[in-house]
Amino acid sequence: MLTLTTLASGSSGNCTLLSDGETHLLLDAGISCRRICTALAALKIAPESLSAVLITHEHSDHISGLATLHKRFQLPIYTSPGTARQLCYRIAALEDVVRPCPPGNSFTAGGLDVETFPISHDAAEPMGFAVSDGNRKAALVTDLGVVTEAVRRGMAGAQLVLVEANHDVEWVRSGPYPYYLKERILGRQGHLSNEDGGALALGAVQSGARTVVLGHLSRENNTPQRAFNAVNAILSAYGPREAGLTLSVAPRDQTGPVYTV
């Protein structure tokens, strides 16, 4: 059995817990260490019992709590070599605990197998993760401007997926952001729109996913209902929704439900 719980998911902070009941993995640490510890306590998990922290990339909404988390608990950190260099440049104390893993490779953390795959984002060497207990698989991918074959392969066969639905394209285009920021968001190294996230979710469902969680929504350029409606329409357009298929949106600033596969 695998469980996934988002502690925060959005442009202002991202942190997710994956667990099989014995091995607990934290994916990103983009909220304060205090918030992480409070959320874990509510789930009856001691922070020191975490097996590892997995970091997708070095942007602040994914690592803002990492320095304090390391200072208190000295947990092993798995990330790509490029991200590892960025982390150690910013937080020298991490050099002893960072374990680089090139995208496309895999490793074992506690009792869980972790696959990595490259993603397209404006960071040093970003990557997504897929975690398996040998029978069940969960895949998580946000912060990407385009869905590549490597992403599809990495997510294939996952029963539970967390995918990005960052923005409504027309809201970005007509909104107050400066031109360069609009181009960044909409570009190939930016973020997935609701429609792009829906297409990715559809592919995941067609390869076995039964739980789809939408994450990393923009506060300014999206709403949970708008993201849900857009993705639900894409899933429904390819036939009646399959029995047992769950679609939901991760909360931005609070702990979400515990999803189990």
Model-identified regions with their sequence ranges:
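Conserved beta-strand hairpin/beta-sheet module of binuclear metal-dependent hydrolase folds
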Residues: 1-43, 127-143, 160
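Active-site neighborhood of phospho(di)ester-bond hydrolases with catalytic His/Asp-centered motifs
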Residues: 27-30, 51-58, 78-81, 139-142, ...
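Active-site metal-binding motif and surrounding structural segment of the metallo-beta-lactamase
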Residues: 33-79
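Active-site environment of divalent metal-dependent phosphoester hydrolases
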Residues: 60-63, 84-86, 124, 146-149, ...
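Metal-dependent catalytic neighborhoods of phosphoester/phosphodiester hydrolases
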Residues: 64-73, 88-89, 222-229
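Metallo-beta-lactamase
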Residues: 81-128, 132-135
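Conserved catalytic scaffold of divalent metal-dependent phosphoesterases
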Residues: 105, 111-116, 120-121, 133-138, ...
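Cap/insert and terminal regions of metallo-dependent hydrolase folds
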Residues: 149-251
